Amino acid sequence: MRLVDSHAHLDVAEFDADRAEAVRRAFAAGVVAVLCPADLTRPESLPAIAGLSAEFPAVMAAAGVHAHQAKDFVEAHLDGLRDLAGRGAIRAVGEIGLDYHYDFSPRDRQHEALRRQLALSGELGLPVILHSRLSGADIIAAVDGERFARGGILHCFTEDWATARAMLDRGFLVSFSGILTFPKAGGLREVAAKVPLDRLLVETDSPYLAPVPYRGSGRRNEPAFVVETARVLAGVRGLPLDELAETTTANFARLFPFEKTGSGC
C-alpha cells in the first residue's frame, strides 16, 4: 500500500522533538510522500521543512501566507515566493485562502492576501493549496476573479457539495482530513462519496485533527495516521483500502510528480 499525506504542518513546534522520526514512522506505515506548507510569516517555518526535504526528498514544500496571518501580509512575502519558485524550492503556493470561522485576520486583509497570492501563482505557473472555512462562495469568486487556471488542492475540505463541484469544475483536487472519520461528519462523507475518484486526496493536517481512533486520546496527529482517513474514505467509496490508496497517490502524483519508491526516501 502506498499513500500520500497531501497536507502536514511538520514545521510547527509540536514536531520539534521528533520531526524526522515522524517522517520515518509515516514511511513505515506506507506513506510515500508528504506535502508540507510553510508559513512565510514565521521565519523558522521554511527551514524546518527544507531540512526534512534534504533528508527525505519525498517531503515536498509549499509556501504562502495563511488566512489567519493575512493581517501580516506584505509585499516582501510575494518577493519571497518568487525567489523560492525561481530556485525550485517549493512545489505550490499555499496554504492560502479564507477563514470566516475564526476571522483571526480582517476579511478585507484575507481577501487581499488571497488575491495577490493567486495572481502570483498564475504568474509562476504553480498550483495552489486553498483553505476555505465557511467561505466557499468567496473562494470560488476569488479563483474566478484572478482567472486562475493552474488548479491545485482544496485542502481539509469541510464545505458543501455545491462548493466541491464548483472547484472540481475549476480543475481542483479535493482533499479530506481526519474530520471525515468523526462520528458526526455524515454530511461530509456524503460529499466524499460524490467526488470523482480521480480527484480525491487524503491528508492529516498534522498536528491537528487526529482521526478516529486517535481523536480524543491526547495523541498528536502525524502523517502515519493518514491511513485511518484513507480507510474511512475507502469504505465510503466501497473500495479496498489498497485500491483507494493507489488511486489517491496517483492523483497527487499527476499534480506533483515524484518518485514513488516503497520507502518514501
Predicted ranges, named:
Residues 1-265:
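Mid-domain alpha/beta scaffold segments of enzyme catalytic cores
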